[in-house]
Swiss-Prot record:
Highest taxon in the source lineage: Eukaryota
UniProt protein name: ETS domain-containing protein Elk-3
GO-annotated biological processes: angiogenesis; negative regulation of DNA-templated transcription; regulation of DNA-templated transcription; wound healing
Organism: Mus musculus (Mouse)
Localization of this protein: Nucleus
Chief localisation class: nucleus
Annotated spans, Disordered: 235-255, 273-298
InterPro entries (alphabetical): Ets_dom, ETS_fam, WH-like_DNA-bd_sf, WH_DNA-bd_sf
Length: 409
């Protein structure tokens, strides 16, 4: 029953319903009725309006409102007896509301006399209405999330799409390739291959490279110590060690007084590794390095060279003021004359501390221990430092401090 129903409609529904004959009944055919159990009728009205404290006094005061509207009037001399003023016409005033109210009351009480076939037809109509509204809702695009019904209908739609895809290609038309999206991870090959020379060693493992570098450092210190001997006749004893590594390559032999030791650290890139070449002759390029274009001899600028006397050989050591320990000054060391050491400029690898490998040479040499005024004594600084710039090939010139020695042999 509708919640917006009025009191007179509620009483009329109770009168039309045969179930509530023990609560209210007709007393005549002209629309007169009597409340047999007025309190029970008031409680039903309170339940309809959600008022639990409803009683007959409140119900009777509500009925007085319809007195003025000429809908219901009180029968004088009879208790709980009322009458619809225009009884035959009262049913025609709102027949639709009355009929709906009556059907709802009958369904609620469970005493409706509808046949089972009618109930099945009614239920089938309701289910078809619900399914139609559900399909319209799903195809309208207004829903924002999946529901159970949509998930149940999804496989059929997918199957239909698949069958249509299989039936599309015909025998008359040539086969058309399906457009497929393929994700491929390809390395970037457009970058220019930067030729980086590496140290050519027999073994490519890191342990072999570390062993070769340690052997190289020990051979360098041995050669410098033999260079500092006063009666050193030959310094080109690196042929056994050079045969073990491709980077140590002996050249054609020279006279003993002109034999020299080259220490080359050619750095083409500040971050790349390059081989150190120890040879008994002129410097040679590694076969793995690409040939570099040379300028004509007329346009080639030779790097400045410095000749140190034999008394200043001891200043090559680690803590010498002429060459600081933290200096990364690139240089060639070549014994051109018996009494002098030839110093030329060349870029030294930043990651190799060449001066640290030469640190134990001067103190451990036999000539160094002969006396306090020997040839290999460190020079004392009396007249200050004399900076001599040694410009490298591709870096700013780095000065080498040369201090005059007061003790000459």
């Amino acid at each position: 029953m509708e919640s917006a129903i009025t009191l007179w409609q509620f009483l009329l529904h109770l009168l039309l319903d045969q179930k509530h004959e023990h609560l209210i009944c007709w007393t005549s055919n002209d629309g007169e009725f009597k409340l047999l159990k007025a309190e029970e009728v008031a409680k039903l009205w309170g339940l309809r309006k959600n008022k639990t404290n409803m009683n007959y006094d409140k119900l009777s005061r509500a009925l007085r409102y319809y007195y003025d509207k000429n809908i219901i009037k009180k029968v004088i001399g009879q208790k709980f007896v009322y009458k619809f003023v225009s009884f035959p016409d009262i049913l025609k005033m709102d027949p639709h509301a009355v009929e709906i109210s009556r059907e709802s009351l009958l369904l609620q009480d469970g005493d409706c006399k509808v046949s089972p076939e009618g109930r099945e037809v009614h239920r089938h109509g309701l289910s078809s209405l619900k399914s139609a509204s559900r399909n319209e809702y799903l195809h309208s695009g207004l829903y924002s999330s999946f529901t159970i019904n949509s998930l149940q209908n999804a496989p059929e739609a997918f199957k239909a799409i698949k069958t249509e895809k299989l039936e599309e290609p015909c025998d008359d038309s040539p086969p058309v390739e399906e457009v497929r999206t393929v994700i491929r991870f390809v390395t970037n090959k457009t970058d220019k291959h930067i030729t980086r020379p590496v140290v050519s060693l027999p073994s490519t493992s890191e342990t072999a490279a570390a062993a070769a570098s340690a052997f190289l450092a020990s051979s360098v210190s041995a050669k410098i110590s033999s260079l500092m001997l006063p009666n050193a006749a030959s310094i080109s004893s690196a042929s056994p060690s050079s045969s073990r590594s491709p980077s140590l390559s002996p050249d054609s032999p020279l006279p003993s007084e002109h034999r020299s030791l080259f220490l080359e650290a050619a750095c083409h890139d500040s971050d790349s590794l390059e081989p150190l070449n120890l040879s008994s002759g002129s410097k040679t390029k590694s076969p793995s390095l690409p040939p570099k274009g040379k300028k004509p001899k007329g346009l080639e600028i030779s790097a400045p060279q410095l000749l140190l006397s034999g008394t200043d050989i001891g200043s090559i050591a680690l803590n010498s003021p002429a060459l600081p320990s933290g200096s990364l000054t690139p240089a060639f060391f070549t014994a051109q004359t018996p009494s002098g050491l030839f110093l030329a400029s060349s870029p030294l690898l930043p990651s190799i501390h060449f001066w640290s490998s030469l640190s134990p040479v001067a103190p451990l040499s036999p000539a160094r221990l002969q006396g306090p005024n020997t040839l290999f004594q460190f020079p004392t600084l009396l007249n200050g430092h004399m900076p001599v710039p040694l410009p490298s090939l591709d870096r700013a010139p780095s000065p080498v401090l040369l201090s005059p020695s007061s003790q000459k042999s």
